[in-house]
Amino acid sequence: MKHSKYISSIAELSESEGVFTTAQAARMGIPRDALHDAVESGRIERIMHGAYRLVGSRSSYIDELVAIWKLTAPSKFTHERMQVSSWDGIAIGGSTAASLLGIGDFYLSPYRIYTPKRINSRNTATKFTKRDIARDEITFIDGLPVTCMERTIFDLVADAEDLSLVADTLNDAYDKDKQFDLAKLRNFFNSKYKEKRATYLYESLLLESDISKGVS
């Protein structure tokens, strides 16, 4: 192997990142040629252009999603993006977040990712939506920033998902998380819509769900 001296560095990067990017590898001094050589020799596999994983390492059904998220800031390591001070506002949301959180009956893909700035992508499996997500509105799942349950429920409504499906998702979230905060959910509606519209959407959702009709 022409670039055998990089094998240990690739293994180290894989150990810390799982799925890793070409730009992350470059920060560790691993050139593109070494990655190409590692693919050809069967040591690593390409998930998509610019993203790899070590062959033989534990793969996950979310590896493609992880790769897509990492490629939104390809040179940053995961631990850097997890820091509160470094929050870039890019989060997994909507139907994809619901799937990851284990609530409702939504599919993981097509992937829905919220970003503070518009991102144009040719990836038909991903829908980037311009939306502001605060750092305290997310949780991390396997290193991925995923909108919290309350935010996810709100975004499903904002994304015009079927209200009955969103109501079922709310039921699941309310049952699964004893700390689920209805007031927090209500505030998300209040922050986006005018008072009359916010009240209508929120109360319609509650009425469609199994949650006490007296809650408002």
Outline where the language-model segments fall.
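Short gly/ser-rich loop at a beta-strand->alpha-helix junction or flexible surface loop bordering the NTP-binding
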Residues: 4-6, 14-22, 31-148, 159-187, ...
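A short acidic, leucine-rich amphipathic alpha-helix
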Residues: 24-26
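Alpha-helical oligomerization segments
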Residues: 194-201
